[in-house]
């Protein structure tokens, strides 16, 4: 995936695409539950699709980062190594803009994903603390975060 050159400030519509909002609109999993990792990947994938739709990324950016397909929200759907590779690909493509709105959104979104309580029927709501702001702030020292841990 080629480097993404994004404006430091994303359009308001994109800056508002929090992980919580993504989860609220995500389909509920079939019997057997869903992997929290798969939802994280689907969120990052959807952000890349929206960046492309707004002309801020190549039309194939999401496909390039995820090996040509949307990650399915199912436990067996995404091997851990493939998930890590996809996220690191996105991080590498945007590393020069670590203070951009995209990284702020991803830091908060992926931290939110780590704190959501998951059950057999998917995420339990509401982790409302992430609704307050997506303003930039220091990166927490959390091993669950990839973005910002170069």
UniProtKB/Swiss-Prot annotation:
Protein's recorded name: Alkaline nuclease
Enzyme class: hydrolase
Keyword Hydrolase: yes
Lineage of origin: Viruses, Duplodnaviria, Heunggongvirae, Peploviricota, Herviviricetes
Residues of the signal peptide: none
Family, as annotated: Belongs to the baculo-herpesviridae alkaline nuclease family.
Keyword Nuclease: yes
Organism listed in the record: Suid herpesvirus 1 (strain NIA-3)
Keywords: Endonuclease, Exonuclease, Hydrolase, Nuclease
GO molecular function: endonuclease activity; exonuclease activity
């Amino acid at each position: 995936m080629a480097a993404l050159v994004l404006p430091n400030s994303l359009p308001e519509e994109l800056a508002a695409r929090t992980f919580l909002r993504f989860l609220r609109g995500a389909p509920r999993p079939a019997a057997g539950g869903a992997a929290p990792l798969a939802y994280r990947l689907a969120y990052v994938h959807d952000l890349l699709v929206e960046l492309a739709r707004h002309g801020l990324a190549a039309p194939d950016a999401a496909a390039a980062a995820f090996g040509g397909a949307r990650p399915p929200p199912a436990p067996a759907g995404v091997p851990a190594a493939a998930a890590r590779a996809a996220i690191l690909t996105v991080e590498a493509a945007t590393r020069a803009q670590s203070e951009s709105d995209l990284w702020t959104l991803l830091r908060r979104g992926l931290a939110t994903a780590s704190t959501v309580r998951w059950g057999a029927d998917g995420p339990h709501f509401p982790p409302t603390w992430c609704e307050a702001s997506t303003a930039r702030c220091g990166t927490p020292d959390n091993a669950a975060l990839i973005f910002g841990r170069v």
